[in-house]
């Protein structure tokens, strides 16, 4: 543990905690500070000027990162008939209906994203108590409740991520791996930032993006300036 502690302290010394870095410089610092033996995930935390307690200031959605996250997403699709065939053809890892519902009720969770056709939501809704807390419940706002399962699966496999403001007004999301070229991380961050700017609630007052911090899984936070 001491060795890990020293690595972290060395990484901390690279970062001026009182400085707000330009995005490119910030990304380079995060990559340099990622010294773990595994390929660390690069994450971003947005502190937004919204009041999540108000219904008109909820922020939730999804965006396809141009270079993906570096993680292969296992997709489960609830669909029947032709839509089930479409999902399989699109590359869904698991496709089913009542059989998959029973499997999940039995404690199976070997998937990362769930898509459902609207006609299946009556049955899928029974899984709300187990899928909801894990952030896996399909939702129209994130494009995971749809009859266009081909598009949904393709987007997820291409690097689509979901975002949702928490109770404190923060949004946390992965934007790639430390092994990514810096320009790819910069472009992924830009895509997410643009999506959040588009999602700004009309009722939000004052500064919208109050604080944006990048970090790797084991590294220190680096504040950056985004537009």
Swiss-Prot record:
GO terms for molecular function: rRNA binding; structural constituent of ribosome; tRNA binding. It holds the Pfam family Ribosomal_L1. One of its GO terms (cellular component) is large ribosomal subunit. GO terms for biological process: regulation of translation; translation. Signal peptide: none annotated. Coiled coil: none annotated. This is Large ribosomal subunit protein uL1. It comes from Brevibacillus brevis (strain 47 / JCM 6285 / NBRC 100599). The gene is rplA.
